[in-house]
Amino acid sequence: MLKIQFHLAWHKAGAQPHRAFKMPGAADWMGEYAGRIGQHATCTIEGGPPKHGGRLWLLDHGTGSLVLSSEELAEALRRERDAGTDSLAVLIGGPDGYSEAAVSAMKPALRWSLGPMTLPHELAAVVAAEQVYRAWSILKRAPYHLGH
């Protein structure tokens, strides 16, 4: 079973995930979507950068990031699943994002953006989690996505 780890770059590794969120309700929403993803894959929320050799998806507002539709994200997730990926880290940057040198060193399998708008990093994390859950819903043809 695929393991998906949301890594919150602004949060200290090993600290309680709910403490990463100062916006009222953001931790609840993040936990809600992580739980929903957990119906399809093992899902965790962690602080700091990933420390494993798995695949990396980088949510980044920078130049070169792909703006994907929900269906395109679902297709990327399907490719990971079908390729036998066992661990997928979704890294969400902090308020300052990443330098091009840092992104280059990470070598992400997917560098994606939620669009040209600037969002608070906590909200971006929640939206990313919702979109990963929606991607699973698309792949499973679940009612969550139908009609949207």
How should each PLM-predicted stretch be described?
Residues 10-14, 63, 96, 118:
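Residues that cap or initiate secondary-structure elements
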Residues 13-24, 64-66, 82-83, 103-110:
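Intrinsically disordered, low-complexity coil segments
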Residues 89-90, 137:
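Short glycine- and Lys/Arg-enriched binding-loop motifs that mark or flank ligand-binding interfaces
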Residues 23, 70-71, 125:
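Conserved strand-to-helix beginnings and helix N-cap segments that scaffold or border functional pockets
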Residues 1-60, 137:
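RNA substrate-binding interface of SAM-dependent RNA methyltransferases
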